[in-house]
Every structure is written in structure tokens, then in C-alpha cells.
Amino acid sequence: MVLAAPLLLGFLLLALELRPRGEAAEGPAAAAAAAAAAAGVGGERSSRPAPSAAPEPDGCPVCVWRQHSRELRLESIKSQILSKLRLKEAPNISREVVKQLLPKAPPLQQILDLHDFQGDALQPEDFLEEDEYHATTETVISMAQETDPAVQTDGSPLCCHFHFSPKVMFTKVLKAQLWVYLRPVPRPATVYLQILRLKPLTGEGTAGGGGGGRRHIRIRSLKIELHSRSGHWQSIDFKQVLHSWFRQPQSNWGIEINAFDPSGTDLAVTSLGPGAEGLHPFMELRVLENTKRSRRNLGLDCDEHSSESRCCRYPLTVDFEAFGWDWIIAPKRYKANYCSGQCEYMFMQKYPHTHLVQQANPRGSAGPCCTPTKMSPINMLYFNDKQQIIYGKIPGMVVDRCGCS
């Protein structure tokens, strides 16, 4: 019995020595550390000390992590904006002062129109990246085609309908011109050119009757002085009409073109038959194509009602007015998003070497954290501390994708 007591004590000490040392680090504190890392930008982990674990609402531990991640993300956004704008503190400009300063400032509508301010608009599920491979469209020439029978009376007018592909209709039109060839005149003359928008026949008129079923809506009228005995190409600004067609494609039934001289002769070449080759009306467009293409988002996307426990991207709207930051002119709010969730060792990490190190020494590291793996900038129009209006682009303010790293 005397020898058994020291032997039993030795076994107990050996069991304590062989107990896994990483078990004490797991639990609520580790979860809080993961939430703090999720609030960082570009995978950087926050140096903020991990707070004490909050009580779990309705037995939902992931809800606690998620709420803590939201709070850390909002505080991180505030400090990042001030830091990236090189401001020591938020400019002390109230809403009343902003109202007084804005009318004295240069016209801001042009800046708001030219630059994309991410505000209340919904963000697409897939992030956009620059397309550096495909050719971009700059100029589009659309030749006149025959009109639909629904807008014809006794087979007239046959011209002109212009067809545009969906790709062109989703571009930004910088300039649109309609080109019409006018026949030569024997002597100088004044020509009255008019363009009428066509609409389908109504129930009151028929193809052979005089019920006036087809409605003409005048959209352009020009007075042209012709002095040359040779033919003349006349261009007409058509951008406004084109915008209307692109917004409502069903309203594009075509147009009718007339150019009458004093004797009533129509000088506009609108015939699509033989003898008028190369003289048909056409539309010239200068467009700015969106060079960004959609790419499949490899990270998980969740909403606030999701029960997902893995690393996921959640929606978060930043409201500058709620902050009391009236010095920001635009946007007043934007969708920032945040990362939250657990990262298990069994999942491959962002960098292969990280995964290998953790596999070789699983107890020797703090473990992977759910952090942003791709971020994008926002444009901002704001007052600085000298009450000057500044336009700038702030990088890394929108979480596009989350991952474990």
C-alpha cells in the first residue's frame, strides 16, 4: 500500500501533462476573436481585444457572433473612411450648414450624373470584374429595314424601321444620328424635312379605307437650304428618340421620312428597292459599352434569417445620416456587407501554405478566420474640414466575397 500511493500519484500527473493544451482556448473567446477578424478589411485581423461572451438569444450562438461582427464592421467602416480621407475627425458640418453651402457651390448635378454613386440601388448577386479579353463596341451602324405591315396602309410606308440588338440597347448611348440622303436640286431651294413616328393601325381604319387609322406623330422638323446640284447627306440628332425606344422597345414601330421642296417633290431617298443602293437611310450610334462582366461568386451569400454557421457574406447597409455625418453629400447610404461564420480545419483555406501549416500543427495556430477575400471601392462626394467639396474614390469599402484565411 505504501508503494501504491506514489505510483497512483505519478499516473495522475502524467495524465494531466498529456491533456491537449488547445482545449482551453476554445469556446466563446475564440468565437469573439473570429468575429473581430471578420470586421477587418482585405483579410487583416482586428487588433481590438475580444469582448466577453454575450448571452445567447433564444439559444442561437451564431446570432451572437453575427451581431458582434455587424457592430465591429460598422465601427471599422467609420475609422477607415476618416483614415482614407486623411481626416483626423469627422468635419463639424451640420445639416443646416450643408444647405447654406450647397447653393453656393458649383453645379453638382453634372458630377452626380457622370459618376456612379452606390446608394440605395441593389447590389448584384455576382460581383463584376473588368473584362480585358472581349472587344468593346464603340460605333454601331443600323441600316433601314422595311416596316411592319401593322403600320402600313396600301403597302406604304415601306421605310423605315431600325433594329437594335439587346446588347446595344444595354449600352450607354453617347451620340445618335439619323442620316438621310436628299436628291440633287437643279437650283437652290428650301427643303422642309420632317420625321414622323409610326404607330399601328387602330380599329377605326383599314388598309383600303380613309378612316385615318394610322397615327403619325411628328418628332423632328427641319428647314434645310440646298445649294448644290449634287446629292446631300443630312444628319439629324436622334439621341432622345433612341433613348425612348430603348426604354420602351415596344414603341419602336419605325419612322416615316419626308423632305419636300417648294414644288412638293419628296427629295428623301427612302426606297429600299434597286437603284438606291448605298443611299438608304441609316442610324449611326456612338456607344460606351460596359466593360465589366459578371463572374460567379465562389463565396457563400446569406441573409439575416439564415441558419448557416459556416463563413458567409451578410448584407449590411451603412447609413451616414444615422451616424450624424451630414458632411457626406453622396451617397447617403450604401451596401457594405460583412463576413461572419465558422471556419473549420477540414475546409481548404485561401492560401495552400496556410492549409498545410494547420494540418502539420493544428494546435499551434489560432485557426482560420472568416474575413473578406475580395472588396471593391465606393465613390464619395463630401465636405472636407475646410468646407470644400471633394469628389473621391475610397477603396476597399464593399465586401464582395468572404472566405477562410
From Swiss-Prot:
Keyword Secreted: yes
GO MF entries: cytokine activity; growth factor activity
UniProt xrefs under SMART domains: TGFB (SM00204)
Coiled-coil ranges from the UniProt annotation: none
Signal peptide: 1-24
Subcellular localization(s) per the UniProt record: Secreted
Description of post-translational modifications: Synthesized as large precursor molecule that undergoes proteolytic cleavage by furin-like proteases. This produces an inactive form consisting of the mature C-terminal portion non-covalently bound to its cleaved N-terminal propeptide. Activation of the mature form requires additional cleavage of the propeptide by a tolloid-like metalloproteinase.
Marked site (Cleavage) residue numbers: 119-120, 296
Pfam families (UniProt xref): TGF_beta (PF00019), TGFb_propeptide (PF00688)
Protein name, per record: Growth/differentiation factor 11
Gene this chain is encoded by: Gdf11
